[in-house]
Amino acid sequence: MLRPLRKSVLASCRHCFKVCGGLPQKQLPLFSPLLLRARYSSTDSSTKRSNKSDKIDAPGFKKIFLVAIIGTVIFVKTVQSLDKNKPKTTLSEEEFENVVKGLKRRVAIFPQGEVDIKFSLSPSIEETRKVLQKSQGDDINELQFVDPVKVIDYYRTLRDDRYEALLNEYYKKYGCDTYAYNLPTGMLVMLLGRYFKENFKTGDKLVVVNFPHSIADATRFENEVSIVSKIFVPRKLSGSDVCKYYETVGKADII
């Protein structure tokens, strides 16, 4: 009786082995601790990755914002630097005075002897010409006459010249007849020197009329432009400081 029972059990085991693929497999319950740990680990890992991604994105936005601000600041500073370095086309009165104070030139435009320059205290070219015609005759044909007011007018109306605006301010303030003699200190002589340099050459004979009005202008002209050979002084102005100054060096000619 035991032998048939053993055979039945063995047969049942073989059948079970075939059904299960030859080896028994271990199956975990639905709520196995291992499964719970795996699910929790996966969720926790995903959360950590999300937080890490947020932390990476936030500094990136801040960096972009800071770069934009820094770029704007650099651009503004660059524009300001260009404005400062950009050549000025006009000068104010204060700026001109600073330029004059900074001038260190000690060499005249025309060394002594290159040109023959004379002053005349007569108020116009016509009057000076008439007086000299009587005393010198045809010799005045070689002379070139310069009226400082006309020189200043030339630069006042010279478009885009750096002194155009400033000269027009004085023109409006003092009028066409006297504004040239009310310019900032040194400006009249400076513009005369510029005009001489642009228009005259070695060997020319020149007479500057209605000039100088002060000893300061006289000495400045001789230091910056050229030495003067003579000054023509109407008799009514023979007592002026300018006449007395040139009398001390034997260059005054009373007419």
From Swiss-Prot:
Transmembrane helix recorded as keyword: yes
Domain of life of the organism encoding this protein: Eukaryota
Disruption phenotype: Increases frequency of mitochondrial genome loss.
Transmembrane segments: 64-82
Membrane topology value: Single-pass membrane protein
Family: Belongs to the AIM36 family.
Protein name as it appears in the record: Altered inheritance of mitochondria protein 36, mitochondrial
Originating species: Saccharomyces cerevisiae (strain ATCC 204508 / S288c) (Baker's yeast)
Upper classification of the organism: Eukaryota, Fungi, Dikarya, Ascomycota, Saccharomycotina
Gene: AIM36
